[in-house]
C-alpha cells in the first residue's frame, strides 16, 4: 500500500521541472571556529503556466536544494499565457532595489533574459519573452521582482470586465494596434 502511494506521489512530482538558480555558502562563527552551511534558491514549474520559487538552508548542498524545492512547490502561482507561449501585456516588477521589465514577444523570438529570469521562464513554459533587469543583480531580488511582475499580469477578459467593456472590443483594439505596428 505504501509502495503504491509513493509511486503515485513520484508521478505527480515528476511533472515539475526544477532549476537551481543560486547556491550560497554561509558561515556561522562559533567558539570552536566557523560552522559552514549552504543556502539554495530553486525555481520549480510545470511548463504549463505554474511556477514557484523556494529558499532552503542546510549543512549540506543536496539537503538545502531539497528544502528549497519543497518550498517552491508549496508557493506556486499560476500565470496566464497568451497562446501558451508569451505574456498578455508588458509588465514591471520590484523587490528591494531590484527592478525587472518584462515584454511580450512575437513568435520565434525565444527567451531573451539573463540568469535567474531565464530559469523562471523556462520552468513556466514561456517560449517568447524579452526581459531586462534594472537595479540590483542579486538573484534573490531578481527572482522576487520577476514574480512580483508575473503576479500583476491579467488576462484580457479580466481587464475588459474591470473596464466595463466587452472582451471582443478589447481584442479588436489590440488587433488594430498590432496591425499598425506591422
Curated annotation (Swiss-Prot):
InterPro entries cross-referenced by the UniProt entry: Ribosomal_Su5_D2-typ_SF, Ribosomal_uS5, Ribosomal_uS5_bac-type, Ribosomal_uS5_C, Ribosomal_uS5_N, Ribosomal_uS5_N_CS, Ribsml_uS5_D2-typ_fold_subgr
Keywords for the protein's UniProt record, in alphabetical order: Ribonucleoprotein, Ribosomal protein, RNA-binding, rRNA-binding
S5 DRBM domain: residues covered: 16-79
Example of a GO MF term: rRNA binding
Listed Gene3D superfamilies: 3.30.160.20, 3.30.230.10
Protein name according to UniProt: Small ribosomal subunit protein uS5
Gene name linked to the record: rpsE
Pfam family, one: Ribosomal_S5_C
Cited PROSITE patterns: RIBOSOMAL_S5, S5_DSRBD
Signal peptide: none
Taxonomic placement: Bacteria, Pseudomonadati, Pseudomonadota, Alphaproteobacteria, Hyphomicrobiales
Amino acid at each position: 500500500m505504501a509502495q503504491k502511494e509513493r509511486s503515485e506521489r513520484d508521478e505527480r512530482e515528476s511533472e515539475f521541472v526544477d532549476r537551481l538558480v543560486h547556491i550560497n555558502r554561509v558561515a556561522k562563527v562559533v567558539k570552536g571556529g566557523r560552522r559552514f552551511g549552504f543556502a539554495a534558491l530553486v525555481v520549480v514549474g510545470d511548463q504549463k503556466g505554474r511556477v514557484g520559487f523556494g529558499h532552503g538552508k542546510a549543512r549540506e548542498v543536496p539537503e538545502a536544494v531539497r528544502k528549497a524545492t519543497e518550498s517552491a512547490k508549496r508557493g506556486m502561482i499560476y500565470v496566464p499565457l497568451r497562446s501558451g507561449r508569451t505574456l498578455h501585456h508588458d509588465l514591471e516588477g520590484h523587490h528591494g532595489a531590484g527592478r525587472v521589465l518584462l515584454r511580450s514577444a512575437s513568435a520565434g523570438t525565444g527567451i531573451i533574459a539573463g540568469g535567474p529570469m531565464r530559469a523562471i521562464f523556462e520552468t513556466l513554459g514561456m517560449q517568447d519573452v524579452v526581459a531586462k533587469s534594472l537595479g540590483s543583480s542579486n538573484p534573490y531580488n531578481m527572482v522576487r521582482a520577476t514574480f512580483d511582475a508575473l503576479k500583476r499580469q491579467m488576462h484580457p477578459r479580466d481587464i475588459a470586465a474591470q473596464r466595463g467593456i466587452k472582451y471582443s472590443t478589447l481584442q479588436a483594439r489590440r488587433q488594430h494596434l498590432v496591425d499598425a505596428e506591422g
